[in-house]
UniProtKB/Swiss-Prot annotation:
Name under which the protein is recorded: UPF0178 protein PLES_56411
InterPro entries from the UniProt entry: UPF0178
PANTHER family on file: UPF0178 PROTEIN YAII (PTHR35146:SF1)
Family: Belongs to the UPF0178 family.
Organism listed in the record: Pseudomonas aeruginosa (strain LESB58)
Length: 160
């Protein structure tokens, strides 16, 4: 299992938490970005800066992630593409994306984008705070534990 981060949109605090969890659990982290980033100084962390272009980082992430991996992203359409590929997805505020909630999340994202485009609503989320960091840490721990259990179960089953 690898952890993928949509690094352009992920708060630094959340990236640091992912690195801590990865070190503890001996997992690889792949940060994918369209802009240069500072790579944390750990051997388990890799940084890929893709060539600029619309959704180039998202496309790379979807192409490289494999079923059973985890992706950290706040981009709902990206999360939808990953979920369809059986890659778990979690946003930096601790909200898990899954097949059951993707329809609602996509509809809400599109509604909010329409309202912003019409000038009926201001842009963006609230600043990333301590409550977000704690919710993310808790959700990340739960999700990594579940994914590791699932991977161990698959590995213990005889191949047919």
């Amino acid at each position: 299992m690898r952890i993928w981060i949509d690094a352009d949109a992920c708060p630094k605090v959340a990236k640091e938490l992912v690195c801590k969890f990865a070190l503890k659990r001996k997992l690889e982290v792949w940060m994918v970005a369209g802009q240069p980033q500072v790579k944390p100084p750990f051997a388990c962390v890799h940084l890929v800066v893709v060539e600029s272009g619309m959704d180039a980082a998202d496309d790379y992430l979807v192409e490289q992630a494999e079923p059973g991996d985890l992706a950290i992203c706040s981009d709902v359409p990206l999360a939808d593409r990953l979920i369809k590929k059986q890659v778990a997805a979690l946003d930096p505020r601790g909200r898990e994306f899954d097949a059951r909630n993707m329809g609602d999340k996509l509809a809400m994202r599109n509604l909010m984008a329409d309202l912003r485009d019409q000038g009926q609503m201001g842009g963006g989320q609230a600043p990333y705070g301590e409550r977000d960091r704690q919710a993310f840490a808790n959700a990340l721990d739960r999700l990594l534990t579940r994914l590791q259990r699932e991977a161990d179960l698959r590995a213990s089953q005889p191949h047919r």
